[in-house]
Amino acid sequence: MARPSRDLAAAERFWVAGLGLTVLFRAEGGGEPGAHDLLMVGHPDASWHLELVHGGDHPVDPRPTDEDLLVLYLDGPVPQELVDRLLDHGGTRVASPNPYWNEWGVTVEDPDGYRLVLCRRGWSNS
Protein backbone atom coordinates (compact mmCIF):
# COMPACT_ATOMS: atom_id res chain seq x y z
CA MET A 1 0.00 0.00 0.00
CA ALA A 2 1.45 3.37 -0.99
CA ARG A 3 0.46 6.65 0.67
CA PRO A 4 1.71 10.22 0.66
CA SER A 5 3.06 11.59 3.94
CA ARG A 6 3.56 15.15 5.18
CA ASP A 7 6.41 14.12 7.49
CA LEU A 8 8.27 10.83 7.07
CA ALA A 9 9.99 11.17 10.46
CA ALA A 10 6.61 11.44 12.22
CA ALA A 11 5.27 8.54 10.16
CA GLU A 12 8.28 6.42 11.09
CA ARG A 13 7.80 7.16 14.80
CA PHE A 14 4.17 6.00 14.58
CA TRP A 15 4.60 2.89 12.42
CA VAL A 16 7.99 1.71 13.73
CA ALA A 17 8.35 2.89 17.35
CA GLY A 18 4.58 2.86 17.94
CA LEU A 19 3.28 -0.19 16.09
CA GLY A 20 6.52 -2.14 15.96
CA LEU A 21 7.05 -2.45 12.21
CA THR A 22 10.56 -2.52 10.72
CA VAL A 23 12.11 -0.05 8.29
CA LEU A 24 12.58 -2.19 5.17
CA PHE A 25 13.91 0.52 2.86
CA ARG A 26 14.56 4.26 2.89
CA ALA A 27 15.63 6.63 0.11
CA GLU A 28 16.08 10.36 -0.21
CA GLY A 29 14.95 11.61 -3.58
CA GLY A 30 17.41 14.39 -4.17
CA GLY A 31 16.86 16.96 -6.89
CA GLU A 32 16.25 14.76 -9.92
CA PRO A 33 12.93 15.12 -11.78
CA GLY A 34 10.35 12.70 -10.41
CA ALA A 35 12.41 11.93 -7.32
CA HIS A 36 10.81 11.77 -3.89
CA ASP A 37 11.69 10.63 -0.38
CA LEU A 38 10.56 7.10 0.39
CA LEU A 39 10.07 5.06 3.55
CA MET A 40 8.97 1.42 3.37
CA VAL A 41 7.89 -0.25 6.62
CA GLY A 42 6.56 -3.72 7.39
CA HIS A 43 7.59 -7.10 8.70
CA PRO A 44 10.72 -8.57 7.07
CA ASP A 45 9.06 -11.92 6.29
CA ALA A 46 5.65 -10.58 5.24
CA SER A 47 4.40 -10.31 1.67
CA TRP A 48 3.20 -6.73 2.21
CA HIS A 49 4.58 -3.35 3.26
CA LEU A 50 3.55 0.28 3.61
CA GLU A 51 5.26 2.61 1.16
CA LEU A 52 5.22 6.20 2.42
CA VAL A 53 6.31 8.95 0.04
CA HIS A 54 7.04 12.64 0.50
CA GLY A 55 8.04 15.49 -1.78
CA GLY A 56 9.03 15.28 -5.38
CA ASP A 57 8.16 17.53 -8.29
CA HIS A 58 4.43 17.22 -7.66
CA PRO A 59 3.94 16.69 -3.91
CA VAL A 60 0.59 15.27 -2.87
CA ASP A 61 -0.93 16.01 0.51
CA PRO A 62 -2.55 13.05 2.27
CA ARG A 63 -6.33 13.02 1.81
CA PRO A 64 -7.60 10.24 4.04
CA THR A 65 -11.30 9.67 4.68
CA ASP A 66 -12.93 8.10 7.73
CA GLU A 67 -13.12 4.82 5.79
CA ASP A 68 -9.45 4.65 4.67
CA LEU A 69 -8.60 1.86 7.09
CA LEU A 70 -5.71 -0.50 7.57
CA VAL A 71 -7.15 -3.29 9.73
CA LEU A 72 -4.93 -5.60 11.75
CA TYR A 73 -6.76 -8.66 13.09
CA LEU A 74 -5.14 -9.54 16.41
CA ASP A 75 -7.29 -12.59 17.26
CA GLY A 76 -7.42 -11.50 20.89
CA PRO A 77 -7.66 -8.46 23.12
CA VAL A 78 -6.11 -5.21 21.94
CA PRO A 79 -3.20 -4.61 24.34
CA GLN A 80 -3.61 -1.26 26.09
CA GLU A 81 0.18 -0.86 26.11
CA LEU A 82 0.13 -1.03 22.28
CA VAL A 83 -2.56 1.65 22.10
CA ASP A 84 -0.61 3.80 24.57
CA ARG A 85 2.58 3.38 22.53
CA LEU A 86 0.78 4.44 19.34
CA LEU A 87 -0.59 7.52 21.11
CA ASP A 88 2.84 8.32 22.57
CA HIS A 89 4.32 8.18 19.05
CA GLY A 90 1.97 10.60 17.31
CA GLY A 91 -1.30 8.70 17.00
CA THR A 92 -4.74 9.96 17.94
CA ARG A 93 -7.47 7.62 19.15
CA VAL A 94 -10.72 8.25 17.28
CA ALA A 95 -14.20 6.78 17.13
CA SER A 96 -15.10 5.13 13.86
CA PRO A 97 -18.25 6.21 12.00
CA ASN A 98 -18.82 2.46 11.48
CA PRO A 99 -20.06 0.97 14.78
CA TYR A 100 -18.58 -2.42 13.82
CA TRP A 101 -15.03 -1.15 14.35
CA ASN A 102 -15.96 0.51 17.65
CA GLU A 103 -17.43 -2.78 18.89
CA TRP A 104 -14.59 -5.01 17.72
CA GLY A 105 -11.51 -2.85 17.98
CA VAL A 106 -9.64 0.37 18.56
CA THR A 107 -9.11 2.98 15.84
CA VAL A 108 -6.02 5.20 15.85
CA GLU A 109 -5.16 7.90 13.30
CA ASP A 110 -1.54 8.13 12.19
CA PRO A 111 0.15 11.56 11.94
CA ASP A 112 -1.16 11.93 8.36
CA GLY A 113 -4.75 11.18 9.37
CA TYR A 114 -4.94 7.64 7.98
CA ARG A 115 -6.70 5.19 10.27
CA LEU A 116 -5.34 1.99 11.76
CA VAL A 117 -7.86 -0.41 13.30
CA LEU A 118 -6.60 -2.92 15.84
CA CYS A 119 -9.34 -5.55 15.70
CA ARG A 120 -9.68 -8.21 18.38
CA ARG A 121 -11.26 -10.67 15.94
CA GLY A 122 -9.26 -13.22 13.97
CA TRP A 123 -8.93 -13.50 10.20
CA SER A 124 -7.40 -15.97 7.79
CA ASN A 125 -7.24 -15.88 4.00
CA SER A 126 -6.83 -19.65 3.78
Q: Can you say where each PLM-predicted feature lies in the sequence?
A:
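Short, charged/polar surface micro-motifs in flexible loops or helix N-caps
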Residues: 44-49, 57-59, 76-80
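Short hydrophobic/aromatic beta-strand element in the GNAT-like acyltransferase core
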Residues: 38-40, 71, 105-107
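Short glycine-enriched loop/turn motifs at secondary-structure junctions
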Residues: 63-67, 99-100
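Core segments of cupin and vicinal oxygen chelate
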Residues: 3-47
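Vicinal oxygen chelate
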Residues: 3, 83-126
